[in-house]
Regions:
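Acidic active-site catalytic centers that drive phospho-/nucleotidyl reactions
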Residues: 7-9, 124, 181
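Acidic, Mg2+-coordinating catalytic module of metal-dependent nucleases/exonucleases
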Residues: 110-113, 119-122, 151-196
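Surface-exposed cleft-lining segments at the edges of enzyme active sites
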Residues: 22-26, 80-86, 168-172
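Active-site-proximal flexible loops/turns
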Residues: 14-16, 131, 188
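Short intrinsically disordered terminal tails
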Residues: 1, 63-66, 194-196
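Entry/capping segment at the start of metal-dependent catalytic domains
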Residues: 1-38
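Conserved DEDDh/DEDDy metal-dependent 3′-5′ exonuclease domain
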Residues: 44-153
Length: 196
């Protein structure tokens, strides 16, 4: 079975991502996405945006509320199969290229999702959509995305928050514990691939 799981790191929330583009050129580990990981069940690949190392302002509603030292990818444990980008535009282009390949080949993509008002909120996907729109990239590549409700996982404590593979680990745990939503999603994906 062919499918891809995706995890986005370094993004605080969708609102802050919007503020990043509204306020200008500031780079801040808690404001913009800086790493995305792709996992196909065997290999983990990542694309990292190389952030400046000096302190950067933290914005809230357009006002500087503090400063932070930005992450540099060398300071963080990353997968071996890693592409390092010089800026967010280059990062976006590479992430888009991966997603387009998955869409063209009908390979399902799994993101984490969170329940909000009885609907699943695709937090990471929404951040990517904001970034893609900023750089005039076709957001239809995100149409292949499916979601896993991570909040309903009874074994959530086994997932290390902020790790590169927390969503992939969730999928593994879900299968291991025969979680119905995970098992049914995998079954549906398998059937859809057979039909291609």
């Amino acid at each position: 079975m062919r499918l891809i799981t995706i995890d986005l790191e370094g993004d605080a929330n969708v609102q802050q991502c919007k503020e990043f583009f509204k306020d200008g050129n500031h780079f801040d580990k808690d404001t913009i996405p800086w790493c995305i990981s792709f996992f196909n069940g065997e290999d983990l690949h990542s694309i990292i945006c190389k952030l400046p190392e000096d302190t950067r302002p933290i914005y809230k509603d357009g006002i500087v509320v503090g400063r932070t030292r930005s992450y540099h990818c060398k300071e963080t444990k990353v997968p071996n199969n890693c592409i390092e980008c010089r800026n967010l535009k280059e990062w976006s282009d590479k992430v888009y290229a991966y997603l387009k390949i998955f869409k063209d080949r009908n390979i399902p993509v799994i993101f984490k999702a969170y329940p909000v008002d009885d609907k699943l909120y695709y937090y990471d996907r929404d951040v990517l959509e904001i970034v893609f729109k900023r750089y005039n990239l076709d957001t239809s590549v995100l149409s292949i995305v499916k979601g896993i409700n991570i909040k309903t996982n009874p074994t959530c404590k086994q997932i290390k928050k902020g790790s590169f593979i927390d969503n992939q680990k969730y999928l593994e745990i879900g299968i291991e514990h025969n979680r119905q939503d995970v098992v049914e999603l995998f079954r549906a994906i398998t059937e859809s691939i057979k039909d291609k």
